């Protein structure tokens, strides 16, 4: 059995091409746990999670990537945020009834794929592409073609392992500033495309690579753990409250007796009463009653 929730990087010794392989289960489950999504939406989030993990692994700096789908369909928003430490979180917004077998275009409608790269130091970059492909992988390949001009292929699979949702994916990309032959890249892509969901989700990474590339020389590097981690905090909520007009905050307190701020990503609730608000306005740190 593979060790799920790990990202593996690998390199072809005889080609200027690098690869990534990721499988997720527990991380995906934690993203889905706090919501009652239709099956088709769960599948989209699973694919987004895999894609975001693969994309963050391409970062050459400390920072994060947000990959989101937005459109005028019943799935108005699906977003996964991850950083270079492979810490992931995600959420979707759904309206109306959605069939379990709805495809991407039916779910999102007329929409866009938005990729936001935020370095810890430096300027933020955002790329937007229309949802012209039939799959998320095809849309992401279009993004790479337009933004980085690096030949890139993604292969994403979803399924279940031991009765729990799981997903996996592989990325192939020509190395920057290298003269990879197009036929070499196409050859490796054809091999990778043969990977089956069951193989990717149930076999160890080295077995997957052997099945796909046993005639090639491949170096597999040490894995990186993938985990769910939400960045919400009481301090961040307090900072958000501080930006609201006093009259609006006071009105909510008068009606409700306290302010309940809910994190869509992890389900945490942060409660603020009148004394907390007074402390926020005086730049003090409020006490920390957090409700899960």
UniProtKB/Swiss-Prot annotation:
Its main location: cytoplasm. Signal peptide: none annotated. One of its GO terms (cellular component) is cytoplasm. Under oxidizing conditions two disulfide bonds are formed involving the reactive cysteines. Under reducing conditions zinc is bound to the reactive cysteines and the protein is inactive. It is found in: Cytoplasm. Disulfide bonds join 230-232, 263-266. GO terms for molecular function: protein folding chaperone; unfolded protein binding. This is 33 kDa chaperonin. It comes from Salmonella typhi. The gene is hslO.
């Amino acid at each position: 059995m593979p060790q799920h929730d790990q990202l593996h990087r690998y390199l072809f010794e005889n080609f200027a091409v690098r690869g990534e392989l990721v499988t997720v289960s527990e991380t995906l489950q934690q993203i889905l746990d706090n919501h009652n999504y239709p099956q088709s939406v769960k599948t989209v989030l699973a694919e987004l999670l895999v894609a975001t993990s693969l994309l963050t692994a391409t970062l050459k700096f400390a920072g994060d990537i947000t990959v989101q789908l937005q459109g005028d369909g019943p799935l108005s928003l699906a977003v996964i945020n991850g950083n270079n430490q492979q810490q992931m979180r995600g959420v979707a917004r759904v309206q109306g009834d959605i069939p379990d077998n709805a495809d991407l275009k039916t779910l999102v409608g007329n929409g866009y794929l938005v990729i936001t790269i935020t370095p810890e130091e430096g300027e933020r970059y955002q790329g937007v592409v229309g949802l012209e492909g039939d799959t998320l992988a095809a849309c992401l390949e279009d993004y790479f073609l337009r933004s980085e001009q690096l030949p890139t292929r993604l292969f994403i699979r979803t399924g279940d392992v031991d009765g729990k949702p799981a997903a996996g994916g592989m990325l192939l990309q020509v190395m920057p500033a290298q003269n990879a032959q197009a036929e070499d890249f196409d050859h490796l892509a054809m091999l990778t495309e043969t990977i089956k969901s069951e193989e990717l989700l149930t076999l160890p990474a080295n077995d997957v690579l052997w099945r796909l590339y046993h005639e090639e020389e491949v170096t597999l590097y040490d894995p990186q753990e993938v985990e769910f981690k939400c960045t919400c905090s009481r301090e961040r909520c307090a900072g958000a409250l501080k930006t609201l007009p006093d009259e609006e905050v006071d009105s909510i307190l008068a009606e409700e007796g306290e302010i309940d701020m809910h994190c869509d990503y992890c389900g945490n609730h942060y409660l603020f009463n009148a004394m907390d608000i007074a402390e926020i306005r005086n730049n003090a740190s409020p006490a920390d009653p957090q409700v899960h």
